[in-house]
Amino acid sequence: MQPPLFKIRQHGYFGFINSEGKTVIEPQYLEAGEFRNGFTTVRLNGLLALMDALGRLYIKRLYRAVGPFSEGLARVQVAQLWGFVDERGNEVIAPLFEHVGDFCEGLAPATFEGRAGFIRPDGQFSVQPVFSQTGNFSEGLAPAGHDGLWGFVDKTGAYHIAPQWDGASTFQEQSALVTRDGHWGLCNRAGEETVPPQFEFVKGHAQGEFFDGMALAFRAGKYGFVSQDGRVAVEPMFDLAGDFGGGLALVEINGAYGYIDREGKLAIMPKFEDAGVFSDGLAQVCADGRWGYINPDGQIAIPPAFQSAAPFRDGLALTVLDGKWQYINLRGEVVWRES
């Protein structure tokens, strides 16, 4: 597994440091993505090039869009069509498809001439394109739409769960999001609706996506949570809520922000002007216009001093002080600062 790298900014250019704050890739790019699975993208002449953790560019061809590597392959877009490259930058599946997803369990959803199926790593269809749209496999099942209705197919392309919903998403362990009449709920792997569609779609939210085993749910103007085992764990009652992390989730009550536990009980009283998700044991909070970090007991771990603060990731967090980027560690020590 590749050690984590963190994006830095210097004089308007982007590069990367390691967790000790040492520069690994010098700031030299006007645009750079985040590293995922050992690779990122940088923009060259208006198009994207792959770059590995050593700073090596794979420029056999530049692309309009590049997806993350999954099972050794990354989707890439040339003009309007998609194909795949391997971890050496070789184009192993030619850009022939109108749409593709990531490889999961040896197959990737792919659309060819308006119909969707599943391809193997050699680019050939394992499940012929007979569907209107398809999603990723998870433990042997994938969402697939046909004649306006969605169900779930196995790796032979046969429906394991009959088409019956207006939409469906990839299973996350035992639950998958399904939609009917503009609302979403959950079904299990037997096709039973464990949470009948009742929640509204909210722009900017990851509908039905589980974090720490819980997913945000919005109904009648209030936020609650559904659990990954297929139940409404916290009835919608909050003006605003954020994703779970470390067993706690941000909620807004009467204009102030605090945190609840998995049962919906207040664990940290609402007293902050703004707040974020718990990660690496700390969450960013805003008090008197400045950002700092608290621990799960609600105690200040890093005093509010920053103009902005991001969640911790792999032991570091990006903060802004006096308009400059800087990374701090879990003790609040600055390991790198923009000059």
PLM features: what roles do these ranges have?
Residues M1-S339:
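Residue-level detector of conserved, function-critical positions
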